[in-house]
Amino acid sequence: MVTTAEKTNIGYITQIIGPVVDVKFPGGKLPQIYNALKIVGTNESGQEINITVEVQQLLGDNQVRTVAMSSTEGLVRGFEVTDTGAPITVPVGKATLGRIFNVLGEPVDNRGPVNAEASLPIHRSAPKFTDLETKPSVFETGIKVVDLLTPYRRGGKIGLFGGAGVGKTVIMMELINNIATQHGGVSVFAGVGERTREGNDLYNEMIESGVINNENLNESKIALVYGQMNEPPGARMRVGLSGLTVAEYFRDVNKQDVLLFIDNIFRFVQAGSEVSALLGRMPSAVGYQPTLGTDVGELQERITSTTEGSITSIQAVYVPADDLTDPAPATTFAHLDGTTVLSRGLAAKGIYPAVDPLGSTSTMLQPNIVGDEHYNTARAVQSTLQRYKELQDIIAILGLDELSEEDRLIVARARKVERFLSQPFFVAEVFTGSPGKYVKLEDTIKGFQKILSGELDALPEQAFYLVGDINEAIAKAEKIKG
């Protein structure tokens, strides 16, 4: 770690504007950009102060401008500030599994201190170009619509795009559950500016499902790093980096395949824009920070696969007002290998997961990667749904009877396909009352082939709603007829 001074370097606060704190240091003893500074003491009203701030700008006149990682309430001008001589560091390694940390790597789950084998700074360089792994392989999730139409890349970056309340967090929780039970790898979850209640629910569900082993934390499969909605923007801006640092250690030192979940990448951008104006930067398009591309790039370029191990990242991206051209989601798009777009229209129909089969994409859906059978089935599903979409206006105006025999058949099959793309989730059992289902890729492909070939034309469409594989749909149809 880089130190900026041989002995303790002490300055004092000259100005406080919300989460932004200006600090003056003695001549020639300025801390470096991104160094962590500590403010510890008691103010005049007897309030204990223990705040970490991060250097963002060198202002001249021996002053630095910093952003606080916790509330600046109770701070006053003249308070002493100590330069730690290094960036914020967080504990890493096996000891982090089953624990919840804040942005500074402090445990917040009332389980005592963490005996970590190492601590690493949250600001690090991306892996060298020559160290990157480029062989594409598919990552099975057990979710039909994802595996068929937007297959995820092992070591890739996937975005879950959707407006408020369409199910981003639920899909993410299902993926964590499926991966922990089916693949057995380690995961890191970074909660960036989302609801504290959701963070708490996620933690409790993981204990229930055994992903976090309460009796023996070392056997847990996930480490959690939270910087929730009520935290100041500094914490929300950096908590993604703290989570990523934990994941990088598992990849680089333990040589493991890691899953990194970030919920929500938009809040990371939003925190940056909150801080940006206070740092005196001119806002850019729609009020975002002018450094939007750089901020997102610094985070995304570190999430990658090397020859030692991989980080597969699944990132929820809130889409403001359902507008995918907003600068925040649009900038994120450029970094992703796959996009899973959630549709409010499908959610309104009660089709969950509400993944838009025509709007979602994946660089993996190529015959030389997934094979001809998978590719042709996926494309046939999409063209059937596309034709159904084109016919909907005619149906709305003239009714089904005015369609040709062939088109009526396409509509009937498309409605079955649409319903078969829904699936009961393990993490949603409490709400739906249906047990969750993990569907293997070959069963998914077989099921859709049977629907499209006309083999199941006689079955009612409701038999395909919220089931696992095609055999369940056939059994459900028997039940309905019976």
From Swiss-Prot:
Source lineage: Bacteria, Bacillati, Cyanobacteriota, Cyanophyceae, Nostocales
Keywords assigned: ATP synthesis, ATP-binding, CF(1), Hydrogen ion transport, Ion transport, Membrane, Nucleotide-binding, Thylakoid, Translocase, Transport
Signal peptide: none
EC numbers for this chain: 7.1.2.2
Protein name (Swiss-Prot/TrEMBL): ATP synthase subunit beta
Assigned protein family: Belongs to the ATPase alpha/beta chains family.
Protein's organism: Nostoc punctiforme (strain ATCC 29133 / PCC 73102)
GO CC annotations, alphabetized: plasma membrane-derived thylakoid membrane; proton-transporting ATP synthase complex
Location of this chain's protein in the cell: Cellular thylakoid membrane
Leading EC class: translocase
PROSITE patterns: ATPASE_ALPHA_BETA (PS00152)
